[in-house]
Amino acid sequence: MKNTTLPTLLLSLALAAAPAAVHAQATVVQTPYKHPKALFDIYLDHPAKMGAALYWLRSFVNPLLEAPYSFFNDDMSVIVVLHGTELVTVAKKNEAKYEEVVQRMRYYAGQGVKFKVCGLALKDYGYTLTDMQPFIEVTPSAMTELVHWQNQGYGLITPLVTDKRFSIEEIR
């Protein structure tokens, strides 16, 4: 005859714990963040996606500005490097077309976020320094800029902006 005492005991314990697990809930964790350094690499296939890419920035910055962290500009360092089609959103002549996106970038620039544009892409698009918004800094190359800041200890975040096929309500 087989000894089934241990498996039976384990099954009984699992079944006894199941109702408690159903009524359990998630817990909030307050990770003790200290002086975060983030580098956003933005390279989009369509300028209309810039708004969605900025939600990645919001998801990083806003929780750090609010309690319990309440960081100030000098408590964190955030750099955004633009080098794709989104470059047109920071051209002064396109401000009316991308007004909401520009206002959001201007807000974050006021919070200490640095917005940098690839100088090579700037030339490729036929823009000059005077064509750019005042909060923009132009770097020699996005690639060298990204490597430089990663070598300084910045964490790289590359927003992935896909086409939205379903509303939140449809998939909830």
Question: Where on the chain are the PLM-derived regions?
Answer:
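Bacterial N-terminal signal peptides
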Residues: 8-18
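Acidic helix-start/capping segments at beta-turn-to-alpha-helix junctions
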Residues: 71-90
